[in-house]
């Protein structure tokens, strides 16, 4: 203004977080085959106001990032802290195909989307169970977009998880290949196979066409 005076219109939120109630991630490396490993971040339950029974292992939520060639990091995530502060353990997976672990690691997803990402998330959950860190009878999975697709595949084609949440996930790969926007219209050629030549693979990996295998809450 002409007066050169500054007026404060809004103040930013000043919510504080008790550092002792923040669950800090532990990097984990999970064996997924004889010579291969997948990576993730494990968050144990943490809340200074409550203690779980020493005899009870916590339930687990496995998170699958989008992309699918994106990545998750150890940065503070309030959504993860929501669950860990309420008694859940969380495994945030960087399955094979994720960015940040070498070109060869990222290229492992080539032609294998809906397969090795699912295998790695299930392997991570089972590995934590074998370590005695989580309850194998109370394991769930969650993801959005490409991570939602991985979640649906895990719930449909694997019996590891008892429940899941797919946020705007993909159920029919053929529909995605034919109806998506132009910028990503050929993206699936590298992740699944060329369309329509590989149509059988698209159908085989689409949870929508195998709904009989989905027998848990979603």
How does the language model describe each region?
Residues 69-75, 100:
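Glycine/threonine-rich flexible loop motifs
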């Amino acid at each position: 203004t002409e007066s050169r005076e500054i007026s404060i219109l809004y103040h930013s939120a000043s919510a504080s977080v008790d550092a002792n109630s923040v669950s800090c991630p532990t990097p984990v490396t999970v064996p997924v085959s004889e010579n291969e490993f997948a990576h993730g971040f494990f968050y144990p339950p943490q809340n200074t106001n409550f203690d779980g029974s020493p005899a009870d292992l916590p339930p687990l939520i496995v998170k699958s990032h989008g992309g699918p060639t994106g990545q998750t990091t150890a940065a503070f995530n309030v959504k993860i802290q929501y669950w860990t502060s309420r008694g859940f353990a969380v495994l945030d997976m960087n399955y094979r195909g994720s960015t940040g672990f070498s070109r060869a690691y990222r290229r492992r997803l080539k032609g294998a989307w809906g397969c090795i990402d699912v295998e790695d998330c299930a392997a991570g959950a089972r590995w934590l169970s074998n370590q005695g860190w989580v309850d194998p009878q109370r394991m769930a999975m969650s993801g959005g977009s490409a991570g939602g697709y991985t979640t649906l595949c895990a719930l449909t084609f694997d019996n590891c998880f008892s429940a899941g949440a797919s946020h705007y996930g993909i159920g029919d790969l053929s529909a995605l290949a034919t109806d998506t926007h132009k910028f990503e219209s050929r993206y699936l050629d590298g992740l699944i196979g060329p369309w329509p030549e590989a149509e059988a693979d698209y159908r085989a990996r689409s949870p929508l066409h195998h709904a009989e295998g989905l027998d848990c809450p979603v």
